[in-house]
Design a protein with these regions (language model features):
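Fold-independent oxyanion-binding glycine-rich loops
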Residues: 1-4, 24-26, 50, 83-86, ...
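Short glycine-aspartate micro-motif
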Residues: 19-21, 106-110, 130
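Acidic/histidine-rich catalytic neighborhood of metal-dependent amide-processing enzymes
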Residues: 49-124
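Acidic/His- and Gly-rich active-site-bordering loop/insert found
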Residues: 1-48
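Short glycine-enriched loops at secondary-structure junctions
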Residues: 24-29, 35, 114-116, 123-127
């Protein structure tokens, strides 16, 4: 476990190849205690968070098991990481902590997509911000029209952000 709470495992290669990071995140969008089990129907598994990103953790372990059981040798080291704080206000915190502490990674693969036929190469980055709007506020009935409402300023800001043109 590293300083960011990530679970890290290293499978050594011969030292003659790139150092590869393969990661999936531990957290889900569901609050703790939401998952009470996994249900199987028609050969499929169902549970909150199973596609984002519990499946990736199973894939990390499955890949490691397959490499070891088949005695597959790699040239480069493979670092397996189950990262923290990907969802919501986590802002990819676990991954950022890991990369800040490990600047020797040559290639990074992230498993985080329900459609395994899709491979995304060089995706854009993201930033997470917390913005607070303060004001006097007031009851909608008793103070209607008498003072600025912070919620109105927040709504205007969100509307302007939604109008941004994202580079392609």
């Amino acid at each position: 476990i590293d300083r960011g709470g990530n679970v890290v495992g290293l499978r050594r290669g011969s030292g003659k190849g790139p150092k590869v990071l393969i990661e999936g995140h531990l957290d889900t969008v569901f609050p703790f205690g939401t998952v009470h089990g996994v249900e199987e129907r028609d050969g499929f598994l169902y549970a909150p968070g199973i596609g984002d990103d519990t499946r990736a953790l199973a894939m990390l372990l499955g890949l490691l098991r397959a490499l070891n059981q088949n005695e597959i040798k790699t040239f480069g080291d493979i670092v397996f990481v189950a990262t923290t704080r990907e969802e919501g206000m986590g802002g990819l915190g676990g991954m950022k902590d890991f990369l800040n502490d490990n600047d020797d990674i040559d290639i990074s693969l992230t498993i985080d997509n329900n459609d395994m036929s899709v491979l995304i190469f060089e995706a854009t980055s993201g930033e997470t911000y917390e913005v607070n709007f303060y004001g006097i506020g007031g009851h909608a009935f008793g103070s209607f029209g008498e003072m600025a409402q912070p919620i109105h300023a927040a709504a205007r800001a969100v509307a302007k952000i939604a109008d941004f043109t994202v580079p392609s």
